[in-house]
Design a protein with these regions (language model features):
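Membrane-interface junctions
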Residues: 15, 30-34, 47, 51, ...
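Membrane-helix interface segments
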Residues: 20-21, 50-55, 126-132
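Hydrophobic, aromatic-rich transmembrane alpha-helices
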Residues: 37-48, 114-122
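Interfacial segments of alpha-helical transmembrane regions
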Residues: 41-70
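Small-polar-interrupted transmembrane alpha-helices in polytopic inner-membrane proteins
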Residues: 60-75, 130-144
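Membrane-embedded catalytic cores of phosphoryl/pyrophosphoryl-handling enzymes
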Residues: 94-204, 209-211
Length: 211
């Protein structure tokens, strides 16, 4: 029953198409178009966090890798056919430019990656306008995959949840690392180079006593 609803909702979204939105959704679903956005996020984080940026960048790279590879792993485990590869739907699916993608579609890698970026970045930026904007951006990316005929709504929803979980988990791991490792290391470095409480004169006084 749930699968039937998923298919019906897919057909409703996929059939509500036009030449204009075909071009818009195809463009939104591309990867290179969003490179300026990713660069803008990194620049903002670099300005805001300065010395911590390198550590943050490492966590961002780890999160992106985990999101992408985990979605591929789930695809190969579940092996749910994309709607455009489903024999019972192939004839009615509206495909833009005839592009269907790989055989399996659960979960959507686009949705996983987009919500990973959204959740991880909004946890660092912490601005209401940004939170709303980046979540809407990720949702539109997910919607475009349904519109283009390459994913069911269920693929996108579950991919979104997976990506959001990965983004939140990596931010939590960063906070834990920053609190328990980086700050302790900074404290150790400060105390290890701190001069005696008496200052340089204390050495002279000690020498005099020995004389």
């Amino acid at each position: 029953m749930l699968e039937q609803f998923d298919q019906q909702l897919f057909l409703f979204i996929n059939s509500s198409n036009s030449q204009f939105f075909d071009n818009v959704m195809y463009a939104l679903s591309g990867r290179l178009i969003w490179v300026p956005l990713y660069l803008a996020i990194l620049i903002f984080l670099g300005i805001k966090y300065k010395r911590k940026f390198l550590i943050i960048l490492i966590f961002i790279i780890l999160a992106a890798t985990l999101a992408d590879q985990s979605s591929v792993l789930v695809k190969n485990i579940v092996q749910r056919l994309r709607p455009c590869h489903n024999p019972s739907l192939m004839s009615v699916v509206h495909l833009v430019k005839g592009e269907c993608g790989g055989v399996y579609g659960f979960v959507s890698s686009h949705a996983t990656n987009s919500f990973d970026v959204a959740l991880l970045s909004l946890m660092f930026i912490k601005k209401r306008w940004y939170t709303i904007s980046i979540i809407l951006w990720a949702a539109v990316i997910g919607y475009s995959r349904i519109y283009l005929g390459v994913h069911y709504p269920g693929d996108v929803i579950c991919g979104s949840l997976l990506g959001a979980f990965i983004g939140w988990s990596m931010y939590s791991l960063y906070v834990l690392t920053d609190k328990n490792i980086l700050k302790d290391k900074a404290y150790f470095n400060q105390t290890s180079i701190r001069p005696p409480s008496g200052g340089p004169d204390s050495f002279r006084e000690g020498d005099r006593k020995q004389e």
